[in-house]
Every structure is written in structure tokens, then in C-alpha cells.
């Protein structure tokens, strides 16, 4: 078997091809050239070896987006060790569950995030040591000191393309997160498809991702894609607020901005930022995580003169497999399959559905993980061999474009017809009074399901007569049976750490 280590392709190739002096990362405090990153990742590999971690064992990362993240992530993979980046917004109980589940030997944690794990690190049976990124080690090891002790050369482990390289835990919008095992070959698979053939990523690009590196989306945006061509990435360790995103755009002038729908909405709607223009070199924006409403895409294009390429990806498939493309955009749809991916829509019996009919999406993906860790039945029902089940329902139009209808468990039938919560929400947020909306099924007095809407109103909105106005508005936009029978005004909507609406929480509250 021919050996293949993802770091040789992602990092060392850039140095060998003459880009060693090029800026790979800046996190507003530190900068790393590709050569710096190569040396530091070798130090990290040597450190892990010294700490007694063996090939294929796991090391967990609860790390903010600073230059230390790629150093640790790539250093582990270089040593044949499996890094497991974790969501930085989990609870202490969730961290205890995941650290036990992945049996991490070492935990790398940012100084600011250490309080979330301080009470549990002593009782994790497999955890040998904690390494803190920052200035205060809290009595544990300090990453900067540990790296400084090591040599900056390391004989990269001759792993294989089909060997586990890293794990990502799915965001668990329903239940506890599941560890998805990704292979060395999966990283290049996303770069050769979406990055190369949809984004057209280039060496002179400067990338800014609102999504953090621990997300599959963020990892591609800010590590795999830029490093695949020797581009530069701006890392931001803070929460991506509209003001901060515009400040980073003004300072670094990125060419690619990767966002999510809730952030695009907030950036468009912040009155104090109406003068912002998003930098001079911006050539393309991307959106994923949840479907981008048509009204948002059109408003963004009108103001900034740049398209948002809306696409769909999952943790299991590592990055975007359905996307709009430059020169081929239809806002309100997820576009077409990314070159290199195949998709099909099936009904409850496994048969193909016709254009215009709702079906569950299956994907054949070169970037699919090999399964979940310690979850055999869930692995078998998701990773079915050639096809991977997404658990999402879509409809395909005559032009071969796909429109998201909802998670399979978010969809519901009204009068025997499927209703997509997303379609009703998209209609509601085009109304001038509505900032955000979420729709769930609610039983009427006869026990039949009908749509119920939770809405966040714009400031200064008058409530009088609004419920009826919104109902009539939706009827006119998308059809009589889809309008929300009940409307509840709320201050905010429950969301995951990724900004996805947690409809199941609203559903639990709706069924009185």
C-alpha cells in the first residue's frame, strides 16, 4: 500500500513549491508563514511523541481560532495521531461525555475555555495530561513552553489514505454529539471538488471564515481550502459579530468571506453599520449551516455587489456537496451537486422521486467519513456503503436544482401535503415587521397538525393587527394551507452553537 499523510500534501508541499515565506495565518496577534507552520507542526508532533501518545490514539482540542489550532491539528496528523477538535461552546457535562467517548490521551485547551473543563479533567480515565494554549497553565502544561522544548524536524509518519486522520463530533441538534471518523484522503477530496471547482480558490486569495475551525464547514474554509493552494487565512478567536466582521474586512481586505445565514442577516440589518462596504477585494461569499433565504441573498448582492454562494454540507461528508456556483445562482435553492458528488432523492420505500416531489437526500461522496465511533447501528443507517444518508428532505426542480425542505424530522403534513418549516419561515422573514422566524407543527383542537410560527419582530414594530396581517401575507406568498394558524412573538429563538434553529425545543414547548 502506498503511504499518504494529509500534512505532506496540505503543508509540506507549499514549502517545497516555494511558498515557505508566504503568510499562512494571522490571528490578529501572531503570524505564521508556511515554513513557520511546518516547523511548529513538527515540534507539536515531537511533543505528542514525548507525551507518550501513539499512532491512531486521540488527542482532544477545545481551542479558539488562533494560530495554535493549525499547529496542534497538523502536528497530530503528521505523527499519525488523531486530533479531535471540539465545539468551544459545549457544557461541562457534554465535554465529559465526549472526552470519555473518544478516550483522549491529551487535551489541548485554550486558557479562556479551561474553566469549562477544570472540574472534570482529573476524572477522565484515559486523559494523561492537559496542555493549555495561552499564558496561564492553571497548574498544567503550557503549549508555548512544550513546543519550545522540541526539535523543529520530524519524520512524518507514513500513514495511508484510508487511515483515520481526525474526528469531528456532529453538532447534535438532536441528542448527544456523535464522533465522525474522517480519513487522510477526505481533506484533499473537499479541496479538489468544492474549493477548486466551485470557489475557484487561488494562491492570492485571503480567506475569512465566520464559522470556527472545529466545525466541518470552518475547517474546510480556513484550513483545507487555503492550504490546498498556499493562500492566506485570517483567524478570529472571538464571537463573529457584525461589527467585528466588518472591522476584520476593513483591516485585512479578504477576497473570500465564508458566513452563515444568521450572520449575513445581522450584518445587513445593523443600523450602526449601514456605511460598511465589506472591503475592496471581496470576490465571493459562501453560506452554509442552514438554507439562505432568497431575500437575504438579493439584499447582500444589492449592497455589496458580491454573490453569496449558498450550499449544503454535513459533518459526515466534511464539506459542501450541493451548491450554487458563480454565474449559476438561484437564490432560495441549494443549487446543484458539486462536481465529484452524486445525489439522489428517495421516498419512504427507497424509490426515486420525480422532479417536484419531496424526497430524502442520499449522497455519494469522496469525502464521506468511515462511520461514527462506537455507534454501530447509527453508522449502518447513515453510511450505507456507496450512499450516505443525510436525513434531510429536498425537492429537485426541472433544471436540476435542489431546494431544502427541512430535516426529515422537522417536516410535517397538513391536509395530507408536506409542509416545509423553512418555506414558511422564508416567507415570514420577507415581511418588513419580522426579523427571524421558526415554524413547528402544533395540533389543533381536532388533533390535526397545523403550522405554528414563533417570530422575533424588528424594533418599533406595532403589534396591533399583526397576526392577521402575517397570516394573510404568507397565504399570498406560498399558499393557503401553509399559513401559520398561530403566531407567538418571542424575544429570541433557541439555536445551536452553529446558529441553527433548534426547532425540536420549540416543538416540545408547542405540544401543550
Each PLM stretch: what is its role?
Residues 90, 107-109, 257, 365, ...:
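AMP-binding/adenylate-forming catalytic core of the ANL superfamily
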Residues 21, 149-169, 176, 200-206:
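Conserved pre-ATP/AMP-binding loop-to-beta segment of ANL
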Residues 188-206, 216-256, 270:
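Conserved AMP-binding/adenylation subdomain of ANL enzymes
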Residues 21-66, 70-74, 91-96, 144-145:
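Conserved AMP-binding/adenylate-forming core of the ANL superfamily
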Residues 231, 254-259, 269-330, 342:
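Gly/Ser/Thr-rich phosphate-binding loop
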Residues 63-64, 81-97, 111-117, 231-252, ...:
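ATP-dependent adenylate-forming carboxylate-activation enzymes
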Residues 106, 112-161, 271:
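ANL superfamily adenylate-forming
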Residues 33-36, 157-158, 165-189, 335:
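Conserved AMP-binding A3 loop
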Amino acid at each position: 500500500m502506498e503511504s499518504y499523510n494529509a500534512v505532506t500534501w496540505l503543508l509540506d508541499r507549499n514549502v517545497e513549491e516555494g511558498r515557505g515565506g508566504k503568510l499562512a495565518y494571522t490571528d490578529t496577534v501572531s503570524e505564521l508563514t508556511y515554513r513557520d507552520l511546518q516547523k511548529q507542526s513538527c515540534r507539536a508532533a515531537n511533543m505528542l511523541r514525548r507525551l507518550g501518545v501513539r499512532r491512531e490514539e486521540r488527542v482532544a482540542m477545545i481551542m479558539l481560532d488562533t494560530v495554535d489550532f493549525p499547529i496542534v491539528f497538523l502536528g497530530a496528523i503528521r505523527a499519525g495521531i488523531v486530533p479531535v477538535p471540539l465545539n468551544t461552546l459545549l457544557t461541562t457535562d457534554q465535554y465529559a461525555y465526549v472526552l470519555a467517548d473518544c478516550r483522549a490521551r491529551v487535551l489541548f485547551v485554550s486558557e479562556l475555555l479551561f474553566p469549562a473543563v477544570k472540574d472534570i479533567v482529573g476524572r477522565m480515565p484515559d486523559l494523561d495530561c492537559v496542555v493549555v494554549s495561552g499564558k496561564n497553565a492553571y497548574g498544567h502544561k503550557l503549549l508555548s513552553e512544550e513546543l519550545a522544548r522540541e526539535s523543529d524536524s520530524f519524520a512524518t509518519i507514513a500513514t495511508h489514505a484510508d487511515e483515520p486522520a481526525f474526528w469531528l463530533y456532529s453538532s447534535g441538534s438532536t441528542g448527544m454529539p456523535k464522533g465522525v471518523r474522517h480519513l487522510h484522503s477526505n481533506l484533499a477530496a473537499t479541496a479538489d471538488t468544492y474549493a477548486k471547482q466551485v470557489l475557484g480558490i487561488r494562491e492570492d486569495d485571503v480567506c475569512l471564515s465566520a464559522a470556527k475551525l472545529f466545525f466541518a464547514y470552518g475547517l474546510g474554509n480556513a484550513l483545507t481550502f487555503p492550504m490546498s493552494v498556499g493562500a492566506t487565512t485570517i483567524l478570529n478567536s472571538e464571537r463573529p459579530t457584525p461589527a467585528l466582521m466588518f472591522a476584520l474586512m476593513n483591516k485585512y481586505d479578504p477576497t473570500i468571506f465564508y458566513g452563515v445565514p444568521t450572520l449575513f442577516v445581522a450584518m445587513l440589518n445593523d443600523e450602526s453599520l449601514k456605511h460598511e462596504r465589506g472591503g475592496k477585494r471581496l470576490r465571493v461569499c459562501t453560506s452554509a449551516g442552514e438554507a439562505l433565504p432568497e431575500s437575504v441573498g438579493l439584499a447582500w448582492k444589492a449592497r455589496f455587489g458580491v454573490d453569496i454562494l449558498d450550499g449544503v454540507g454535513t459533518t459526515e461528508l466534511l464539506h459542501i456537496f450541493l451548491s450554487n456556483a458563480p454565474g449559476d445562482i438561484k437564490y432560495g435553492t441549494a443549487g446543484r451537486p458539486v462536481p465529484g458528488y452524486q445525489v439522489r432523492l428517495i421516498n419512504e420505500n427507497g424509490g426515486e422521486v420525480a422532479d417536484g416531489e419531496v424526497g430524502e437526500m442520499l449522497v455519494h461522496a469522496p469525502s464521506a467519513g468511515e462511520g461514527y465511533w462506537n455507534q454501530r447501528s447509527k453508522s449502518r443507517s447513515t453510511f450505507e456503503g456507496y450512499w450516505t444518508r443525510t436525513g434531510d428532505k429536498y425537492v429537485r426542480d426541472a433544471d436540476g436544482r435542489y431546494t431544502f425542505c427541512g430535516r426529515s424530522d422537522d417536516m410535517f403534513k397538513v391536509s395530507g401535503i408536506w409542509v416545509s418549516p423553512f418555506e414558511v419561515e422564508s416567507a415570514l422573514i420577507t415581511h418588513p415587521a419580522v426579523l427571524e422566524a421558526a415554524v413547528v407543527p402544533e395540533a389543533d383542537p381536532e388533533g390535526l397538525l397545523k403550522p405554528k410560527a414563533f417570530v422575533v419582530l424588528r424594533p418599533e414594530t406595532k403589534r396591533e393587527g399583526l397576526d392577521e396581517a402575517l397570516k394573510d401575507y404568507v397565504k399570498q406568498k406560498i399558499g393557503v394551507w401553509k399559513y401559520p394558524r398561530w403566531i407567538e412573538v418571542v424575544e429570541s429563538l433557541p439555536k445551536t452553537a452553529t446558529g441553527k434553529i433548534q426547532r425540536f425545543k420549540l416543538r416540545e414547548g408547542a405540544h401543550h
